[in-house]
């Protein structure tokens, strides 16, 4: 399954979840596209609920199915902690996500573009791989040639707050993951147990 590249508002309404973090997609119509009103959502089967929850999480991070599933498999090899939360931590440690959490981009999709275009440094070295796994304490910064990119400056200015597990210096345009997040600090609307149940049946 390829990565979804269509309108984020349509996908957000289908999933009942804001994919940009702003909630704007659901502000006017928080029901499925094509549905005649908010009360006509059909009841899902157990499999349907698991699939829907998996899709919510996958689309939130903007990943294709193969990449998402492979990351889940990696999470199964971590011996400490719970599988669902370990999976979410791996998603959170992706470079594109950390760039987004730092407020260097307004969406994860934009953060991925910044990484792909070589605007982002990790410990002073350019990294253009969005899936790069960030370690606690590594410094994420903007390349000197990119510090005046309007979209980056606009994102920093528009960011009103950042998670407690990151630090950021707006003057230097750099920050870091200071610790791993707690479960209640990330995606509280997701029931990761349903995602685990879905993949346990598939793998």
UniProtKB/Swiss-Prot annotation:
Q: How does it assemble?
A: Part of the 30S ribosomal subunit. Contacts protein S5. The interaction surface between S4 and S5 is involved in control of translational fidelity.
Question: Which Cys pairs does UniProt list as disulfide-bonded?
Answer: none
- GO molecular function, a single term: structural constituent of ribosome
| S4 RNA-binding domain location | 93-156
Gene name as annotated: rpsD
**Function text:** One of the primary rRNA binding proteins, it binds directly to 16S rRNA where it nucleates assembly of the body of the 30S subunit.
| Protein name, per record | Small ribosomal subunit protein uS4
Q: Which Pfam families does this entry report, sorted A to Z?
A: Ribosomal_S4, S4
- GO cellular component annotations of the record: small ribosomal subunit
Q: Which InterPro entries match?
A: Ribosomal_uS4, Ribosomal_uS4_bac-type, Ribosomal_uS4_CS, Ribosomal_uS4_N, S4_RNA-bd, S4_RNA-bd_sf
Name the SUPFAM superfamilies for this protein: Alpha-L RNA-binding motif
Q: Which domain of life is it from?
A: Bacteria
Q: Which GO terms describe its biological process?
A: ribosomal small subunit biogenesis; translation
What UniProt keywords apply to this chain's record, in alphabetical order?
Answer: Ribonucleoprotein, Ribosomal protein, RNA-binding, rRNA-binding
List, alphabetically, the CDD domains matched.
S4
To which protein family does this belong? Belongs to the universal ribosomal protein uS4 family.
């Amino acid at each position: 399954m390829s990565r979804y590249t269509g309108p984020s508002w349509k996908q957000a309404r289908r999933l009942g979840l804001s994919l940009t973090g702003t909630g704007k997609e659901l502000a006017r119509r928080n029901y499925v596209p094509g549905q005649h009103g908010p009360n006509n959502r059909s009841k899902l089967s157990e499999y349907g609920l698991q699939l829907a929850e998996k899709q919510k999480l996958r689309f939130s991070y903007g990943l294709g199915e193969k990449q998402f599933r492979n990351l889940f498999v990696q999470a199964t090899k971590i011996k400490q902690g719970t599988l669902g939360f370990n999976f979410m931590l791996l998603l959170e440690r992706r470079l594109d996500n950390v760039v987004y959490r730092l407020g260097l981009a307004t969406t994860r999709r934009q953060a991925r573009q910044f990484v792909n275009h070589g605007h982002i440094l990790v410990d002073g070295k350019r990294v253009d791989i969005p899936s790069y796994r960030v370690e606690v304490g590594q410094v994420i910064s903007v390349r000197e040639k990119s510090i005046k990119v309007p979209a980056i400056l606009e994102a920093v200015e528009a960011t009103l707050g950042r998670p407690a597990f990151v630090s950021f210096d707006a003057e230097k345009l750099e920050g870091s993951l200071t610790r791993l997040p707690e479960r209640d600090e990330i995606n509280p609307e997701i029931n990761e147990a349903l995602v685990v149940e879905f993949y346990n049946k598939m793998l």
